[in-house]
């Protein structure tokens, strides 16, 4: 159950937050680790919020200006790197003291991102594939073998809501920044679906409130 201390509109964000929490659990990441999150969409942002709450340093990679701004506003990442503007490998190695990251999360379904994560994860590190791919992907198996990487999949959540809710109740995660719009039920199609279809780079969670006037 969700306590009365969490507003109902924020409670609606618990479900996608639990997706991020489950990915964190699958990774085995520990406090003090450095994580590389590939992609700053809704799941990438919420996953990063969980990682930060768990004392993990977060490096996020993202190309979209709007998504970079949302990551900055919500404070979920310690570093936000745009591969089109900087040398990603050089910057990550600088941050990690040439060691590579402890764990990496793929949240884009883009093969180039997956390749970067495999390249920049340290030996014996973990790469977690969070996004659902609708097309075949390739992975540099030679790098996986030579660095003894663990490549893991994760899907949705498995009995993670209790721990996820606790993070919010304890004030370790503020869900308000992830509510990008509140709309009336009558505006579900004209404002909700239209924004998700045509301007989804700026949308994280759109709340439909039948009581709005």
Can you annotate each of these PLM segments?
Residues 15, 108, 156-159, 183:
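Residue-level signal for the nucleotide or nucleotide-sugar donor/cofactor binding architecture
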Residues 115-119, 158, 162-213:
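C-terminal hydrophobic helical "lid"/dimerization subdomain
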Residues 4-85:
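Mid-domain Rossmann-like dinucleotide-binding core that forms the NAD(H)/NADP(H) cofactor-binding site
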Residues 2, 20, 51, 71, ...:
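Residue-level signal for nonpolar/aromatic packing positions in well-ordered secondary structure
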Residues 27-29, 59, 69, 74-150, ...:
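Glycine-rich cofactor phosphate-binding loops and adjacent beta1-alpha1 units
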Residues 3-9, 174-179:
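Short glycine/proline- and acidic residue-enriched helix-loop micro-motifs
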Residues 62, 131, 155:
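Conserved acidic E/D residue at the C-terminus of a beta-strand in Rossmann-like folds
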């Amino acid at each position: 159950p969700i306590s009365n201390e969490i507003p109902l509109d924020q409670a609606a964000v618990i479900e996608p937050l639990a997706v991020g929490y489950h990915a964190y659990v699958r990774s085995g990441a520990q406090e003090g680790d450095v994580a590389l999150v590939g992609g700053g969409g809704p799941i990438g942002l919420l996953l990063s919020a969980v990682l930060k709450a768990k004392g993990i340093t977060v490096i996020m990679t993202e190309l979209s200006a709007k998504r970079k701004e949302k990551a900055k506003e919500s404070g979920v990442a310690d570093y936000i790197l745009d591969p089109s503007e900087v040398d990603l490998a050089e910057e990550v190695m600088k941050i990690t003291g040439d060691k590579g990251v402890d764990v990496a999360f793929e949240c884009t379904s883009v093969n180039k991102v997956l390749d970067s994560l495999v390249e920049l994860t340290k030996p014996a590190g973990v790469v977690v594939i969070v996004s659902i791919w609708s097309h075949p992907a390739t992975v540099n198996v030679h790098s996986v073998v030579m660095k003894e990487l663990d490549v893991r999949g994760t899907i949705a959540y498995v009995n993670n809501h209790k721990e996820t809710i606790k993070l919010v109740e304890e004030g370790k995660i503020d869900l308000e920044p992830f509510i990008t719009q509140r709309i009336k039920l009558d505006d579900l199609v004209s404002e909700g679906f239209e924004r998700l279809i045509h301007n989804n780079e700026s949308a994280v969670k759109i709340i439909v409130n039948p009581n709005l006037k």
